[in-house]
């Protein structure tokens, strides 16, 4: 259920600029979103997996907090992340 190194590196370079910039809020939100999609697929196959469901809810909360922080700090970067990840309609 974890991201492979190649997928993680691709997400980091896409949203962070280079492979060393992992602390950027956009990178963290993108990684959270990627893990959320993977866990959602896992939970569709295994609906009784309550531990993974709890992990999914925790990751959703972390992404929500990171997006709220990004919205308060820089609204332009927030809107760009939403557009790139197709999070809001």
Curated annotation (Swiss-Prot):
GO terms for molecular function: rRNA binding; structural constituent of ribosome. One of the primary rRNA binding proteins, it binds directly to 16S rRNA where it helps nucleate assembly of the platform of the 30S subunit by binding and bridging several RNA helices of the 16S rRNA. Belongs to the universal ribosomal protein uS15 family. PANTHER family: RIBOSOMAL PROTEIN S15, BACTERIAL AND ORGANELLAR (PTHR23321), SMALL RIBOSOMAL SUBUNIT PROTEIN US15M (PTHR23321:SF26). Part of the 30S ribosomal subunit. Forms a bridge to the 50S subunit in the 70S ribosome, contacting the 23S rRNA. HAMAP family: Ribosomal_uS15_B (MF_01343_B). This is Small ribosomal subunit protein uS15. The gene is rpsO.
